[in-house]
């Protein structure tokens, strides 16, 4: 990529809309924009807005609002100009064509964020978070990406780096100045333990982060012909599952994504639980049992017109709700159990609103206090942190085994370099500065 040229691109999605935005960034952003704007752009103060017209070769394109942000006080760290025009395809595309003809280059995908990273406005973790913010399809995924973009994950990585550097400084004293008074070796071990605690906390958050981003899994289970598939269709407002009066119609796992008040839920319809000699149906039943074990919640659907069936033990091992379906045909019986119960009718919609409210409170309770926690969702981050952990554990073992300090320092340097892969920073030699700041070497 040419780092000193000026780029331009349409920043809003294509299609009809009230406003479209064309963004320009680079050393010539102001001069190039001045060639198509009606006002004196070079004289505009930073962070000001100006109403005017965009024209090219004597032809007016559109009335626009120009926003100017001078370097380094911009997203990319360069001079940035944004032109807000009427929405739709033609206005913004003609403005972009005019800018390109006057010297701007069409930006590559993600190039504005890449320049922000290269100019030190954001680190690599934050750059990745921008894409996750845009792609988020539920509130949990959005909150996780927002947390990363705000720098909370980066702060953890910086803390890990600082602890590694501090440990390495002590080890370098042993290697480079063996004749001097040796420092307390409990200090580097303590720093490594602190770093490992942070790393373990981040690594352990990966599965939970994946679950939050992908959605809470809830299984619809119960005996055959109780109305599980009808309930799936009623909740999602789609005819997704085949519904018949024949028991055992559902023989495989059917998953449907559903959004409830911004929360993504993976509804899983499963085969009815009963004794059967049919090998295909039996396979479906076993898959249903496996799905219940892996799910975060179970909706156990029962037929209100039938006697209460026995409840499987798994319902008492995770959040579960007993649903008496077909309440429009009969008054549901009550089971003497600690599990909550609700009467519904998937056919008429009775009780569906109450069920949605119950599920919403269910999820809110499970996720209480999690919005402020740092979760991993990237396999790249997860893999790198595992590598760092391996290096630090090896270094710690070397300390305890009193291996030569050069070998311990090698593991720590590997860990430090790998940590830089998270933030995208270049690893500089700062160990000598750390040593001089902590010890009077010549004394």
UniProtKB/Swiss-Prot annotation:
Question: Has the keyword Iron been applied to this entry?
Answer: no
Query: Any idea which GO molecular function terms this record carries?
Result: GTP binding; GTPase activity; metal ion binding
Q: Cite the InterPro entries for this sequence.
A: G_TrmE, GTP-bd, GTP-bd_TrmE_N, GTPase_MnmE, MnmE_dom2, MnmE_helical, P-loop_NTPase, Small_GTP-bd
What GO cellular component term, any one, is given? cytosol
Binding-site residues, K(+): 225, 244, 246, 249
Sequence positions that bind GTP? 225-230, 244-250, 269-272
Every copy of the TrmE-type G domain together lies at 215-364
- State what protein this is by name: tRNA modification GTPase MnmE
Please name the source species: Chlamydia felis (strain Fe/C-56) (Chlamydophila felis)
The upper taxonomy is: Bacteria, Pseudomonadati, Chlamydiota, Chlamydiia, Chlamydiales
